[in-house]
Amino acid sequence: MDFYRALSDYYDEIFPLKGPQKTFLQDYIRRESLTSVLDIGCGTGTFAIETSNTGVRVLGVDLSEEMVEISNKKAKKIGSTASFSLADMRDLSRINEEFDGVFCLGNTLAHVSGDIELKEVLTQFGKKGTHLLLQTVNYDRILAKQVKELPMIKTAHLTFYRHYTFRPDGLLDFNMKIEFMDSREVVSGTNLLYPIKVDRLKKTLLETGWEVSGQWGNFDKDAWTEESPATVLAARRIPR
């Protein structure tokens, strides 16, 4: 089995929606009075479908055809109003609508190639919405402690392994492996990531017309520290 097909098929089992994520999204949507959301890097549509359950109009986009296919099937099966289409966060020109909010969660943003592309992507986000919610791995912690391995995830059917390789150019090779319990089949893949530290992210947000309105270390809304597992930032577009 191809690694990315396997990851798509078992994504919801590996990364199920948790209570704090659900509560955070509901609170954020209510606080910012959002009526429409563009979910960039939507994966299998978990956040998009959950957001649509609050009555918000949602379009989820992803670079993976497999993810979009699964998202559409999930939405149809449960009668969700969320819609999904194929798009790359680096080029959102085919999306003609504007939205109240733009979500870029699940470490999607770290797939930019560096500072220049980060600036280009955040500028594009500002053309699609007035409120922005970002979530990445806390790369301040990863870089400071030279973390080479993330916690192993075990489910009823598989074990998911994740390792970092630190590259001389400052990027990270994110090495992933899925081992299936029954068949003992092993599939693996590698993604290239740009480890965005929080100060760099906040500086680039300001440079691209965004003002940070909230910062947390997880979806429980704990204060962000260098030890936090994640970086969660909310921002509002600065009026021109």
Show the residue positions of the predicted features.
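SAM-dependent methyltransferase
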Residues: 133-204
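C-terminal lobe and adjacent flexible extensions of AdoMet/dcAdoMet transferase-like proteins
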Residues: 200-240
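A short glycine-rich, Lys/Arg-flanked "PGG" loop and its adjoining helix->strand segment in the class I
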Residues: 117-131
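Short conserved loop adjoining the S-adenosyl-L-methionine
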Residues: 91-97
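A short SAM/SAH-binding and catalytic strip from SAM-dependent methyltransferases
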Residues: 100-116
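Conserved class I S-adenosyl-L-methionine
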Residues: 1-32, 34-43
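Class I SAM-dependent methyltransferase SAM/SAH-binding core
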Residues: 45-91
